Amino acid sequence: MFVTQDIVLRLFFRKKKILNNGFSIPKNSSIILAPTHRSRWDGLVLTMAMGRRVTKNDCRFMVTKSEMRGIQGWFLKRLGCFSINQLSPSLSALRYAIDLIEKGEQLVVFPEGKINRYGKKLVLKEGLYRLARLAAKKTTAITIIPIGIAYSKIPPNFRGEFCLSFGKPIPINDYSNFTIKDFNKFLNEKMTQEEEKALKNVGR
């Protein structure tokens, strides 16, 4: 998978930038990555920046059932993706996600729930916070990391640029008294801040 990832990214994109903003993964913490979702390229560029070669852990993506069909589904499985029904998530899918978090895997959840093109305000679904609170019953040290992903063009163009900006880790237990609405507003602000940094670095 590393070879496929390297070849595809190097051939398609001319330049990459990663803004870690002093970012470091908290020790002994289970990680949930919360990136903006602008393109089908997001999974590949995020794996490059936060995958096994960088963090010693794979990125495991939670995606919609429709995204796991056909050739795209085959490729997503190779990236470490698994599907969930957004309207009616099964207990087995939720248990699987919680088990990944408990084992210390890096779970990737796109809080917007779908690809959201530029020019549209971020609207976050309720699933991420619900999942994090459920997982917190199994393991107390859960950290959400807001991430902004930007491309020089949308849709990403051949020999274009991309940038990832990592925000300050958010310990979920520090916000256990938040309502879903309040937490989503807070996370929305953090993701937007990181996306704005990433956009600036690709000339947008």
Regions from the PLM with identified roles:
Residues 30-32, 104-110, 143-145:
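Residue-level preference for the first positions of well-ordered beta-strands
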